[in-house]
């Protein structure tokens, strides 16, 4: 009979055990979220200024 192959983990355990990899991923995530937050503020305040000028 055939042998069952043990299921492989989706996440590599070696990656999560290395603090440099986790730290690098954290920094990349923070930069990305900060950039998206700046874009969101630019869009929101840009539209607010346009709406104020149109009312006057």
UniProtKB/Swiss-Prot annotation:
Q: Which source organism? A: Mus musculus (Mouse)
**In what tissue types does this protein appear?**
Largely expressed in non-muscle tissues with the exception of weak expression in body wall muscles at 14.5 dpc. Expressed in epithelial cells of the trachea, bronchus, lung, intestine, pancreas, and liver.
Complexes and interactors: Homooligomer. Can also form heterooligomers with other sarcoplasmic/endoplasmic reticulum calcium ATPase (SERCA) regulators ARLN, PLN, SLN and STRIT1/DWORF. Monomer. Interacts as a monomer with ATP2A2/SERCA2; the interaction results in inhibition of ATP2A2 Ca(2+) affinity.
Alphabetized, the UniProt keywords read: Endoplasmic reticulum, Membrane, Transmembrane, Transmembrane helix
Source taxon at top rank: Eukaryota
| UniProt topology in membrane | Single-pass membrane protein
What is this protein called in UniProt?
Answer: Endoregulin
Which coarse location class describes where this protein primarily resides?
endoplasmic reticulum
Q: What does this protein do?
A: Inhibits the activity of the calcium ATPases ATP2A2/SERCA2 and ATP2A3/SERCA3 by decreasing their apparent affinity for Ca(2+).
Gene Ontology CC, one term:
endoplasmic reticulum membrane
Sequence intervals crossing the membrane: 25-45
Q: Where's it found, cell-wise?
A: Endoplasmic reticulum membrane
């Amino acid at each position: 009979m055939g042998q069952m192959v043990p299921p492989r983990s989706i996440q590599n355990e070696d990656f999560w055990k290395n603090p440099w990899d986790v730290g690098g991923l954290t920094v990349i995530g923070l930069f990305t979220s900060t950039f998206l937050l700046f874009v969101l503020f630019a869009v929101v305040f840009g539209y607010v200024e346009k709406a104020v000028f149109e009312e006057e």
